[in-house]
Amino acid sequence: MITKWKVFNFKSIREETELDLGPLTIFAGANSSGKSTFIQSVLLVAQTLAHKVGSRSVVLNGALTSLGQFDDLKSNGGKSDQITIRCTCQPLPDQEAAIPRRSQLAPRGSSIYYGSRSNQIQEIACEMSFDADPSSSQRDLFQIQPRFFATQLSCLSRDEDNVDQKVDISIHHSSKAISEIEGAGSVSAIDDQLRASLAYAVELDENSMTEVKEDFRSAKPIGCILRHFLPERIIYAIDTIEEDASAITIALQDDGRRTGGLRRSMGREIILSEEIIAVLREVLQDTIDFDQTFKDKYRQESLFGSESETLTFRAWHERLRGLPREERLNAQQVLREHENLFDRIHSAMRTSAAPKSETHALVQARPPRLITEATWYLDNFFASSFKYLGPLRDAPKPLYPLAPAADPYDVGLRGEHTASILELHKNKKIRYISSANLKSPVIDRKMVARTLESAVIDWLQYLGVARSVKSRDMGKLGHELKVGLSDSDSTYDHDLTHVGVGVSQVLPILVMCLLADTDSTLVFEQPELHLHPKVQTLLGDFFLSMALCNKQCIVETHSEYFIDRLRFRIAAASPENELNRQVKIYFVEKPLQGSSFREVVINEYGAISDWPEGFFDQSQQQAEEILRAAAMKRKASRRNKDA
């Protein structure tokens, strides 16, 4: 679930604005006040991470919204050249699920889960900035495909001992030439992808660097390969001599348990020089008569071979491991207890290195574990668990198009795929709060398991727009939807062109919400359009039930009936099951040149203590004016009679 969202220098949001978002978040305000601007910033991030071309830092014109070019987005008169967006997410565990959810983007065999288990992610925060680089010769290109400027990503997790650990990574555009980057200037061959990655400077926290140094002792992050604005691979500069010395030391002191992975990461054989052999001879000389042992067992001259023989560390290590068990364990004990073994081997390798040999290399690896988990969660969340339904839904049709192959859970921006999605999943079992649980003032939060079709019919009946709904696959023609309107007309169902527009407006909302997984975020603009005030009122109950099922709903609305229903439910809630923490309401206004967001707090009694001017007060003002006009008319009438 998204818990916080910050926007800066984005259209009418000129100043840095960070809002707390709840399970049900409502935006209300006058037209062109900035409600849609805030939602567009969320859509921008979602359509970017869902985009298949990872080289695009942000996708301005995509599947969810078309925003034009960079200058259309940047606030007029803004003090900064960059647009900044920050999101904070808290993964919600599915308390009803027996098996926690696994990231769909995690590699096969990995164990990255979000749910009730150890090492659970508690919070992820990601801030990204982009610009059009006005000084660049590519400014025209950057207008359509903005340039990545910076990303800051942090992840808070809790282990099985309930100990919290926080990691973070900072990536920003760098103006350094490759020759100025420590560890990269001496590398002879750099391909185009690596060269592009060195345009970004990377900083990792201390815990993450400790994890990196378990594999690469000398690693220094100097670049990054991005997928959009998230890190996919980090480029490290390593000292090859130090890494070879570390590989030898670990293999000797860990009984070879890690040599396979280190050899694979280095990708080459390590040759034992005379200086290294001298160190090993000195360390092991008092342990056992290796020469005699090998003459008896292998008929070889020595453990270290002849002076003319080129000996690789792998071959020598195999000879060492081939000793009889007692002698081998004795030698390994000596090696493990030798405190400065690495320093001596490292010094010997430095001494034996050729004067002009290349001692640095670049390696690329996934980011440290928790940072990788955070990027996978954000990718999975915005690509799969984020859905959007626009304000202008499709008009009623006799037949509806086939479902999109890319996302079989997407009803479409206008709800155009609702019929096919309902037909595809109508027998799927879902968990939801039945409408019967909301027929009393206090909501019963117990969930039931029914098919999607049954759940949709349940809420259609509660809203009073239809008695039943049936979907039918018509082959290449598409899908048909028919509804029954009343019990008296139970023998005949109608297609949506023969019933009120309200059914076609409500169905996409119901299907999209009921089919969504736990820890989804669902965004709606003006869901009340074309709906009777009574239906608008009861729609507040439906969205509240979704929030209680851990499905976050972000709603832009102009409906005072919707707001009043939420106030009633909050006032009616029992003290132990308060609802005001489930709801966040923001009143958006534009006093000067920029949008201003003001939180409207509903207390436990359903009252708004600090009522903003212009916040659904028109009907009350109109009622006062009617009473005032009526009083004046009566007064004038009495005067005329008296005259």
Task: Enumerate the language-model features and the residues they cover.
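Long, K/E/R/D-enriched contiguous segments that form extended
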Residues: Q332-D343, A348, A353-P368, A383-F386, ...
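Short, polar loop/linker segments at the starts of domains and inter-domain junctions
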Residues: G22, I99-A106, Y400-G415, R598-E604
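Short, cationic low-complexity segments
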Residues: R108-N119, Y409-H425, W611-G614
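Switch/communication elements of ASCE P-loop NTPase nucleotide-binding domains
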Residues: M1-P93, I443-R639
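Sequence-level detector for tyrosine residue identity
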Residues: F8, Y113-Y114, Y200, Y236, ...
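P-loop NTPase switch/coupling surface
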Residues: M1-P396, M447, S471-R472, I570-E578, ...
